[in-house]
Amino acid sequence: MTKSNGEEARLGGRMERFQQGVRKRTLLAKKKVQNITKEDVKSYLFRNAFVLLTVTAVIVGTILGFTLRPYRMSYREVKYFSFPGELLMRMLQMLVLPLIISSLVTGMAALDSKASGKMGMRAVVYYMTTTIIAVVIGIIIVIIIHPGKGTKENMHREGKIVQVTAADAFLDLIRNMFPPNLVEACFKQFKTNYEKRSFKVPIQPNETLVGAVINNVSEAMETLTRITEELVPVPGSVNGVNALGLVVFSMCFGFVIGNMKEQGQALREFFDSLNEAIMRLVAVIMWYAPLGILFLIAGKIVEMEDMGVIGGQLAMYTVTVIVGLLIHAVIVLPLLYFLVTRKNPWVFIGGLLQALITALGTSSSSATLPITFKCLEENNGVDKRVTRFVLPVGATINMDGTALYEALAAIFIAQVNNFELNFGQIITISITATAASIGAAGIPQAGLVTMVIVLTSVGLPTDDITLIIAVDWFLDRLRTTTNVLGDSLGAGIVEHLSRHELKNRDVEMGNSVIEENEMKKPYQLISQESEIEKSMDSETKM
């Protein structure tokens, strides 16, 4: 009895303390609300002006788009209407190339080989971990919900798919990592094309003769060899920045400059100044971003031919992708950030709000890169050496949303075709989806191109990608937002894990600057004295 009474007393005391704490917090909140002045409201609005304007732009753009849909605007009218949004995309894409090069060069040059190696390893481990988790989530969700019930005969098809083999796509990825011409890499990527070529294939006579029907064997063989054709790979190219090649070159170049010490100081200062100038241009463009996002979203809604597709045949598929992306973006990534850093992930994500909304509007992680830099460095205070290293690489190869989408879409197409996948084929899909997402450049709808590789790996019809193109414009924006969130949280995690190396580097740089300043003075005095002595000697000789 005494024990139970003691436990009840302790529980009662805890409840009372909890209630007192709640009452105190409530009173403090009331006091804060009562003490809010116009100046406080103005300062809050000024601090969060970008975010508030961007959120307002998304809401107004959505309403405006649905309001204008009944007017059935022509293609030309839609393009004119979307022109302010097109300007935003062009301005952001204009800054991507110099930003990737300058940020990676300065980021690598600011770190020693040991620190950059550790940071790079942590970033790669994070990228691979989150991508594999995303693929697993996509596979589990699509198997549980099973959105591919029914038949594909009544489903709407849209667009055409370019055929590509997995081997050629992988080789193209490796080739693009090492561009032969850096200038060309700024506007072109290598891509294998296919041509039909005729070949003379030797055929044994016993394979073509059937009794006495064919009298002239040589003539029959000649006829057969003329129609024998094969698709052969030939070198080609497509327009677009070869981001992967520029990332590899910039990392190597920055690493070399960092090891050159004093000799590389001029180059370090040049790229540092270039990076700072680009970020100042970004600050100017950010004021225009809300207007551009408004017209991008409104224009895309007006441009859609049939809104019923999302709510009709592909409704369950769309819901499945959204659920998978939400689980990864709202649960997995914040939880991973909290487990590593022991910090509130939602405060960190709050500082990224404008970058996430820009990703939603532009559907391009590369175009969002300038805004992501601004949000991480200014709002969340992430070390510039980390953002300059992690973000450009992440925007190029870390695509969690794309990997999740490709694995999920491949299994959806298998379900639509009543194709039963075994465990080995599901593993194959997960591996190829992970690899294909690395090869997907940060450009709109790149996932559709790389998904051909995933479908080919398990023998699924690649033409069935046309079944899901109708909703890809919408899902592309969601997975791009997930990609940007993954890159940004990765920068926060890598900074936390690399804090000791960064501090040690700061100490080393401080000591080296002091030593350099001390060494310069006596050197200048000696050189001046030696010049005076030389001139005196020459005068006496004269």
From Swiss-Prot:
Residues annotated to bind Na(+) 2: 396
Disulphide connectivity of cysteines: none
Intramembrane segments: 346-376, 426-459
Domain of life, source organism: Eukaryota
Membrane association type: Multi-pass membrane protein
Catalytic activities: K(+)(in) + L-glutamate(out) + 3 Na(+)(out) + H(+)(out) = K(+)(out) + L-glutamate(in) + 3 Na(+)(in) + H(+)(in); K(+)(in) + L-aspartate(out) + 3 Na(+)(out) + H(+)(out) = K(+)(out) + L-aspartate(in) + 3 Na(+)(in) + H(+)(in); D-aspartate(out) + K(+)(in) + 3 Na(+)(out) + H(+)(out) = D-aspartate(in) + K(+)(out) + 3 Na(+)(in) + H(+)(in)
Record keyword Secreted present: no
Phosphoserine PTM sites in chain numbering: 512
Pfam families: SDF
Function: Sodium-dependent, high-affinity amino acid transporter that mediates the uptake of L-glutamate and also L-aspartate and D-aspartate. Functions as a symporter that transports one amino acid molecule together with two or three Na(+) ions and one proton, in parallel with the counter-transport of one K(+) ion. Plays a redundant role in the rapid removal of released glutamate from the synaptic cleft, which is essential for terminating the postsynaptic action of glutamate.
UniProt comment concerning the protein's domains: Contains eight transmembrane regions plus two helical hairpins that dip into the membrane. These helical hairpin structures play an important role in the transport process. The first enters the membrane from the cytoplasmic side, the second one from the extracellular side. During the transport cycle, the regions involved in amino acid transport, and especially the helical hairpins, move vertically by about 15-18 Angstroms, alternating between exposure to the aqueous phase and reinsertion in the lipid bilayer. In contrast, the regions involved in trimerization do not move.
Assigned protein family: Belongs to the dicarboxylate/amino acid:cation symporter (DAACS) (TC 2.A.23) family. SLC1A3 subfamily.
Protein name in UniProt: Excitatory amino acid transporter 1
